[in-house]
Amino acid sequence: MSKGIVVIITGTLSLLFSSLMEGYSQDGSGHSARIMFYNVENLFDIFDDTTTDDDEFLPDGIRRWNYTRYSRKINSLYKTILAAGEWSPPAIVAFCEIENRKVLEDLVHGTNLSKYNYSIIHQDSPDPRGIDVCMIYRKNMIDIISFRYLLPPVTGDNPDATRSVLYSRCLFSGDTIHLFVNHWPSRRGGALAGECIRMQIAGMIRVKIDSITSVMNSKARIIIMGDFNATPEDQEIKLITEDYDSGMSMINLSESLAGGTGTYRYRGTWEIIDQVIVSDGLLNCRSGVYSHPGMLRIFKPDFLLKKDPLYPGLSPFSTWTGYRYQGGFSDHLPVILELLVR
């Protein structure tokens, strides 16, 4: 083969690769957008909030939480978000275990994320510890039509024993995305712990989806993401994915993730409790914004993992092991969903 032909082929492949990368990059051209969810494991500031139980995250508290540790945590999260975007940070980053708006402002405005024009959606939840669900979004890529925080009609002795669900209508490339961000009650004390409230939240979301589809039939683009403290096999998740009267289907994309993987590791076993559920309207649309199961992944670069000291294999490099500080990122791994446009 002559040198001239090699040059032509190499140049053609280079142009093809560049065009493909452009189509999947977040350069503001509207070709794609990444949505990330991340349980950030207790992102507290170092100041006392007299309205919540945050005493352990004070400089004189049991965790000795101080400015140095807080700054390291902020910079670790910035590093993770930037790496998750590859070409540029995700269009939307949804969080849970955030104490207040101030820590989000420190993350968005106090790091190099300030270059990416992020805006904040946050509201204090009724959680006794004061940890909230919230999100940041890039204003040059996403418009927020509206948002509200939803609470189920919780029954029982403790009506404040849950977090709000953040529901927002987001406009991307001319299409409306209905986005729900969740952090359901923990299974601490066993899998059945908190199940009643988790079922109530699932029922509330199902009612909201019925309301959306009553207006848009089965064409609505819906994304439900978060830390559900339940696996794809649990009944509270199945309640969301059961058949709807409108004929629309909700598909749990997390079920398609490879076996042996997960977002959280408990006693040496990976679990997928941070999940993404989407409507078939997002998967099957013939034009506009869409996604498909292969576009969901668990973000697990080497720096987010460490050797598990008790069990074979790797675990998330967490900030804490019990009450012992180890300076890592989070005890959960983030999940990322890619949205494309056709």
Per-segment meaning from a language model:
Residues 51-54, 175, 180-194:
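Active-site His/acidic residue clusters
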Residues 41, 98-99, 185, 228-231, ...:
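Catalytic metal-binding/acid-base residues of hydrolase active sites
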Residues 23-117, 121-133, 304-313, 317, ...:
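N-terminal, active-site-proximal structural segment of metallo-dependent hydrolase catalytic domains
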Residues 98-185:
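Structured beta-strand-rich core segments of catalytic domains in phosphoester-bond hydrolases
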Residues 1-30:
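Bacterial Sec-dependent N-terminal signal peptides
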Residues 26-27, 209-222, 230-342:
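Metal-dependent phosphoester-hydrolase catalytic domains
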Residues 61-68, 89-95, 122-123, 154-155, ...:
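Second-shell loop/turn segments in exported
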